[in-house]
Structure formats: structure tokens, C-alpha cells
């Protein structure tokens, strides 16, 4: 974290000297990325965006986008995103947010599910979800999305901890809600079309029309 602060301050310092600076952030810089730190530092420096240095944030692809593309359509209705990292946010606050997501029946995307120093967080999170969701609720674990080392498992909330070897800082976990189902290894979160429309045409009707 201190390196991130140093990088941000250095980028701002170069920009204030008239340099064109690119600060690279993984995923989307506006989702758990570097742009928040840049703006916090600038706010502390009383930066004026009208006559101060020019800042442009170029959007990227966050883990919630890349991982959902690999496992079906898990984010078709309302969803929540929670990071398990307690380096900057107290664990007690993270627990409150997890519980709120579980109670609200949100599909939940979990960033930073574990590290070498953090081994209990995901177990505690799973226990919270099991209070409000069925054990067979679909869960996806995606490690290293779109990298050569990519690994994907679609399992259940009950069996989530059976895959501890996949958990780490480049892993994203997606917990389905009460409507999510597993179809041939894909997580599908229905948008609600089926309650309003007939989704697939009847075979006999199609043949007659032809």
C-alpha cells in the first residue's frame, strides 16, 4: 500500500512539472484502483480541476466483468461487490457489508478473497451467506481470468472451502442469489424475462410456419 501512495505522489509531482504521465492500474482504475488515491491526494493538496493539472481516467475491464464473461451470465440482476482485504477497511465494517448483501439477496462479487495473512475471512463470509442462502447456491471461483494460469470452478456455497488452493489476490469469487442456477457448468442469473414472455418458440409452431 505504501508503494501505491509513493507511485501516486510521484505521478502527480511529474504532472505538476508539466510532464505527461501515465499511471497504470490493473483492471478498472476506478474500481479498487489507483484513480481514487490520485483524487484523494489532489483533494488534500486543494487541487482545482479548472486550472490545476489535467486528470483523465481511462476505464478498463474489472474482474467482475472478465470473470462473469467466463462463467455465463451471473450478473443479470442487482449485485454487490465486496473486497475481503482489511488493510484499509476494518474487518467489522466488511462483515456488515457482507451481511447486508446476503440479507438483500444480492449476487455478490468477492475481490481479494484470501492472502497468506488472511485465511479466515472467506470462511466467515461463507458462514454469513449460509444463514440466508441454501447450501446448493451456485458459486464461481475464477483465478487469473484470461491469463495463461486461468482456473475456473463452478461449485456450491456449501463446497466453497474445498477449493482453498485456488484462493488468492488474483482470484474472484461470485456468489449467486436465490434465483441463480447452474446449467452445464455455467452460472445463470435470470433477468425475469421468463415471467413475462415465452422464451423459446414451440417446435411444432415453428415447423408449421416454415
Residues of each region from the PLM?
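Alpha-helical scaffold segments in soluble metabolic enzymes
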Residues: 10-13, 37, 66, 70, ...
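A contiguous loop/helix-start segment that scaffolds small-molecule binding in enzyme catalytic cores
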Residues: 20, 103-210
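Short, ordered loop/turn segments at secondary-structure junctions
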Residues: 2, 27-29, 87, 144-145, ...
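A generic local secondary-structure boundary/capping motif
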Residues: 12, 55, 69-71, 95-99, ...
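Class I S-adenosyl-L-methionine
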Residues: 1-55, 163, 202-207
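Short, acidic/turn-prone active-site loops that include or flank metal/cofactor-
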Residues: 1-7, 81-88, 193
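Conserved active-site and cofactor/substrate-binding residues in soluble primary-metabolism enzymes
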Residues: 2-6, 29, 33, 62, ...
Amino acid at each position: 500500500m505504501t508503494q501505491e501512495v509513493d507511485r501516486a505522489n510521484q505521478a502527480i509531482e511529474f504532472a505538476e512539472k508539466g510532464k505527461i504521465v501515465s499511471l497504470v492500474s490493473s483492471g478498472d482504475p476506478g474500481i479498487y484502483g489507483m484513480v481514487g488515491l490520485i483524487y484523494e491526494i489532489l483533494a488534500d493538496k486543494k487541487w482545482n480541476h479548472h486550472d490545476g493539472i489535467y486528470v483523465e481516467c481511462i476505464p478498463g475491464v474489472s474482474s467482475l466483468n472478465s470473470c462473469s464473461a467466463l462463467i455465463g451470465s451471473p450478473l443479470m440482476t442487482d449485485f454487490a461487490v465486496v473486497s475481503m482485504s482489511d488493510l484499509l477497511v476494518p474487518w467489522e465494517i466488511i462483515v456488515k457489508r457482507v451481511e447486508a448483501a446476503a440479507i438483500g439477496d444480492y449476487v455478490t462479487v468477492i475481490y481479494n478473497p484470501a492472502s497468506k495473512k488472511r485465511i479466515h475471512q472467506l470462511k466467515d463470509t461463507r458462514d454469513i451467506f449460509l444463514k440466508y442462502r441454501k447450501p446448493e447456491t451456485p458459486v464461481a471461483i475464477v483465478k487469473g481470468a484470461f491469463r495463461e494460469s486461468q482456473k475456473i470452478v463452478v461449485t456450491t456455497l456449501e463446497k466453497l472451502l474445498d477449493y482453498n488452493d485456488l484462493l488468492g489476490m488474483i482470484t474472484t469469487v461470485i456468489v449467486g442469489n436465490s434465483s441463480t442456477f447452474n446449467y452445464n457448468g455455467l452460472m445463470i442469473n435470470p433477468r425475469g424475462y421468463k415471467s413475462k414472455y415465452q422464451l423459446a418458440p414451440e417446435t411444432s409452431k415453428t415447423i408449421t410456419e416454415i
